[in-house]
C-alpha cells in the first residue's frame, strides 16, 4: 500500500498513530458543552446568549469560535412563526386613550404592565390564556387560563397580579381594545386599584409590542412543538414554560443577558 501511494512505511505509521491536535481536542470538548447548553436552553439561544450561558457555567469561549462550532454542529434556534390576533375590538364599550404611544421606557418594576389574550389549540378544544407582563423586568407577572375568552378570565389574571405585586397607584395598565379589557367589571378593578388605563389604537399590534413579543416567544419556543390531546396537557406545558423557564432561566438581551427574575432581584438589591 505504501508503494502504491508513494509514501514511506515510517511515514504511514506516523500518520496512523498521529493524535489530534490540542486545538482539535479542545473543540471536541467544547462541542459537547455547547450541545448540552443548547438542549438546556431549549434550543432558543443564538451565539450571544449561548456564550453568556456557557460563561456562567465556567466555559469561556470567544464568539467567533462559538459561532463556528455551532455551525459545525448544525445547531439552530427554533424558527419564528406569525400568529393571528385574538381579541375583538368591534364593540360599543368605552375605550381608554393610548398613554404609551409605543414608548415602553419604565425605570422600575410595576410602572407599566401590558396585558393580552391568546389561544392554544388542543384536541379537546381551544384553551385561552390571559397574561400580564411587567415591561421593565420582562416578567410575566400573572396569567390565567380557561375554556372561554371572557372578562372573567382577564379579570382573574389582573386580580392575581395585583394581589401578588401590590403596585403603587399610577401604574399604567396597557392592553388592546378587546371587549374583555373594556368591560365595566374590568375597568372597576383598575380604578379601585389606582391604575391608569391605556389602550392600543384599533388594529395596531405594535402598540402592545412587549406582550405580542411574549406570545410569539411562547409559541415559537414551546407550544408550536406540541400536539395537545387536551387542555390539561397544554396548561401543564404553559405553566412550566412561564414559571420555570421564561421567568427564572431564559436570558433576555435587553436585560443584560439575565433572566427577568434575576433582573428584578438585581434592581431591588441596588435600590436597597
Curated annotation (Swiss-Prot):
BP terms from Gene Ontology: DNA integration
Sequence ranges assigned to domain Integrase catalytic in this UniProt record: 105-268
A Pfam family matched in the record: rve
KW Cell wall biogenesis/degradation (keyword) present: no
Keyword check for rRNA processing: no
Ranges in coiled-coil conformation: none
GO molecular function list: nucleic acid binding
Keywords: Transposable element
Gene3D superfamilies listed in its UniProt record: Ribonuclease H-like superfamily/Ribonuclease H
UniProt protein name: Insertion element IS600 uncharacterized 31 kDa protein
Organism of origin: Shigella sonnei
Upper classification of the organism: Bacteria, Pseudomonadati, Pseudomonadota, Gammaproteobacteria, Enterobacterales
Amino acid at each position: 500500500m505504501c508503494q502504491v501511494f508513494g509514501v514511506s512505511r515510517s511515514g504511514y505509521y506516523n500518520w496512523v498513530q498521529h493524535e489530534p491536535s490540542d486545538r482539535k481536542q479542545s473543540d471536541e470538548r467544547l462541542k459537547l458543552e455547547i450541545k448540552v447548553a443548547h438542549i438546556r436552553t431549549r434550543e432558543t439561544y443564538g451565539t450571544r446568549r449561548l456564550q453568556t450561558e456557557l460563561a456562567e457555567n465556567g466555559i469561556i469561549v470567544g464568539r467567533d469560535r462559538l459561532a463556528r462550532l455551532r455551525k459545525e454542529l448544525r445547531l439552530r434556534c427554533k424558527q419564528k412563526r406569525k400568529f393571528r390576533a385574538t381579541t375583538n375590538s368591534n364593540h360599543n364599550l368605552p375605550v381608554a386613550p393610548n398613554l404609551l404611544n409605543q414608548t415602553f421606557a419604565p425605570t422600575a418594576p410595576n410602572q407599566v404592565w401590558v396585558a393580552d389574550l391568546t389561544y392554544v389549540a388542543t384536541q379537546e378544544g381551544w384553551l385561552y390564556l390571559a397574561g400580564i407582563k411587567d415591561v421593565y423586568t420582562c416578567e410575566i407577572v400573572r396569567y390565567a387560563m380557561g375554556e372561554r375568552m371572557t372578562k372573567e378570565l382577564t379579570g382573574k389574571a389582573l386580580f392575581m397580579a395585583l394581589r401578588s405585586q401590590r403596585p403603587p397607584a399610577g401604574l399604567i395598565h396597557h392592553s388592546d381594545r378587546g371587549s374583555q379589557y373594556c368591560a365595566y367589571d374590568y375597568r372597576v378593578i383598575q380604578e379601585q386599584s389606582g391604575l391608569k388605563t391605556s389602550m392600543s389604537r384599533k388594529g395596531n399590534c405594535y402598540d402592545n409590542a412587549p406582550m405580542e413579543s411574549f406570545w410569539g416567544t411562547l409559541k415559537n419556543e414551546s407550544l408550536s412543538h406540541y400536539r395537545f390531546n387536551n387542555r390539561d396537557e397544554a396548561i401543564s406545558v404553559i405553566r412550566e414554560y412561564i414559571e420555570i423557564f421564561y421567568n427564572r432561566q431564559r436570558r433576555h438581551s435587553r436585560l443584560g443577558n439575565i433572566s427577568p427574575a434575576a433582573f428584578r432581584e438585581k434592581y431591588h438589591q441596588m435600590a436597597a
